[in-house]
Amino acid sequence: MRFKTSSIIKLSIISSCMMLSANSFSQKTGIFEGQTDVGKVLHSGDAIYNSANDEYSVTGSGANIWFTNDEFHFVWKKMKGDFILRVRGKFQGKSVEAHRKFGWMVRQGLDTSSAMVAATIHGDGLTSLQYRKAAHTNVEENKFDVSGPDVVQLERKGNQFIMSVAHFGETFVSRQISDINFDGDVYVGLFVCAHNKNAVEKADFENVRIVIPAGKDLVPYKKYLGSHIETMDVITGKRKILYSENASLQAPNWTKDGKNLLYNSNGSLFLFDLKTHKPKLFPTGRVKDINNDHVISFDGKMLGISARSPDGKIGSTVFTVPMTGGEPKLITPLLGFSYLHGWSPDGKWLTYTAKRNNDPTPAGFDIYKIPSKGGKEIQLTNVKGLDDGPEYSPDGKYIYFNSVRSGLMQLWRMKPDGSDQEQLTNDDYNNWFAHISPDGKWIVCITFLKDEVKPDDHPFYKHVYLRMMPASGGPLKVIAYLYGGQGTINTPSWSPDSKKIAFVSNTDMSE
């Protein structure tokens, strides 16, 4: 068969375009499955993943994302169902285009006029939830009062989308839209648009997370989501996932030599080697059914654990065991539930929350201490409701704890003999588990939203913040935005140098 020269050229061009498109679509970048330019862009974009730093750089051109046509660069993965997208992002350099933009986007397809929802941050600070409900229709938007946030979250719940933003350190502000009806799989990812067909812009992204939340049929403590063990620099907020497993991993403690993390899972304890990134079973003899309240002594020689009593009748009692492992020694009396949270700096005392017969309320737990070698327990608090999370300061002058006595769960402290109980926080959130840095300068806690969680509860699988404040007093600052809760940071998790913390975040890993 004979072809004309012009026909051969046309076929070659078509073939080349198909190859470029295929390569663009199939290029895996970090957690994303592919990337492509959407629309008729003049300058090809790109997305690069730095695995060492767990960061993304996305370059994009394109005239706009507006009216009935979009032009931008998109790094994406296909998903279905509900999800939570979260990132911290910023543009590289300055630009003459006030409306260059980046953010999260969910699209029905990769064509230029697809139905879509975008959590959009513009170069001049304009922040908006933009959406096109049907293909070939104009984009609509819901603007925020916040200008230029760097933390961006987009959540899908059925046909509802919720955009939440914050300047790092602050709590989220949200907007939402409903009646967004996508069919089947959608394209989910990060985008950059130059807002100028002749220009190219670049944005950097860190702490990129795609979370699949718990379904409505999940029964707490019967079924669990997967877990990420993460570490974070508390000053910069930079996070890194060290280990992931489709199981409930909880409450990592940093060992005093800085070499391992100790966590619990499925009733046992594990040591996670920070060099090899491999866990190994920590031997606890006949003691099983260990929960997430375990604490390493200040000198690093002993471990306190909370586990079912030897007779199996009490769900949690306190034991001690050498950090080399062995047969634990029962410390607390068999009078009711006891959950360990702290050692005294000299190693002579353990402090814990316990339920005894003198408080008939369901959540009636008070703070106690007991000699670490065993002996008579001493009650330190005695109020209705829940006192929890007692932890000694490194100088031994205070025991920090959280209490619901003022209405919401707030942070408190007292002298080691129970005197001079004073409230440290008083905000519109539920703040749990005050963890004091080894240098005594900082307090980190986990914060639950009062609209999602009762003050005396700290359940799995919720939107939570990790927040930090000076130990000398001051406002709480958000240092992490995550999906977690129970098991995230129940017990001390500071690195020995007071620069980092370890914690657990959650997502469904069943598929």
What is each PLM-predicted segment?
Residues 27-218:
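Extracellular glycan-recognition regions
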